[in-house]
């Protein structure tokens, strides 16, 4: 009996301590620090606060229609902020999240078998994980039997591969999510509600509640509809900045240039976007991926879109070797490089044709499943 009383006393003490901590907690206090390297390869600790995370959970739960019957399959490692979209809503609703063995993402048939075995009905994966399934014609052998919500993000979904998914699961909802870690992971969404041409890009749509997207030009002025500007985020989704790095924080968390009346921070994402004729936000590319080549300004993403349109191509990645002044294209597909280049000459102007083209057996991926552009850049420089 004595140990039981001691345990009870310890529990009471812990409860009081926890209550005291919660009672002093502010919604602007840090809740976690997650390290991200983005496109630079240099880790930065992003400090999120309770307010931004709570708002994120509410918005994501509404968009993906979470409830206690949601059966989620986790794709990203738990040390990436992307896993939060699975863990927090699961806790909020008493839903279920299954941790998918990392090795299965190398074997698409076994991956779909896992989804069926555990009756997974919702996924929120990076595009590379989804295209790996469709590009290897997995659906000819096995289909996900329970999936009704497929959310994706972090990369542009090639329309050709998206069509395969939608034709395979015609009753499912497909949702494109967009947002940087500095905006608590995701801050925009678009539910795919129509067919797209192969040369189109799926919109990132509209911002979450309590968030606004500003498209600013180089002079910090709003761009006109249809023009490209830097995607800047304002609102509750903003994190607190970079841990112990005030210099870097002040570079991208800046005073709203459209507001000269009181202090208000916005986050400059480094992404370029525009609004289409429907008023939907379109992701164009990273500023890092916009290059000057042969006297022309080029979006590397535009090259990738045209490559991915080709029937025999599964996926591609274009990088720029600035030192040598060459565009290098890496791809997975059935075509040989010389045949691919001949096709591209009918699709692209001469200055956008890759100087080097290399066929890969497998696309290198980062730990969270995205195409590893930093690795491919180094590979191109070593050629």
Give short role names for the model-derived ranges:
Residues 17-35, 66-72, 78, 210-211:
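Conserved pre-ATP/AMP-binding loop-to-beta segment of ANL
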Residues 44-73, 81-121:
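Conserved AMP-binding/adenylation subdomain of ANL enzymes
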Residues 33, 75-76, 100, 125-126, ...:
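Short hydrophobic "strand-cap" motifs at the C-terminus of beta-strands
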Residues 9, 95-118, 124-132, 156-157, ...:
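ATP-dependent adenylate-forming carboxylate-activation enzymes
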Residues 92-95, 120-124, 134-203, 212:
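Gly/Ser/Thr-rich phosphate-binding loop
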Residues 1-2, 6-16, 36:
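Conserved small/polar residues in nucleotide/adenosyl-binding loops
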Residues 9-10, 14-23, 53, 173-176, ...:
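AMP-dependent adenylate-forming
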Residues 33-46:
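Conserved adenylation A10 loop of the ANL superfamily
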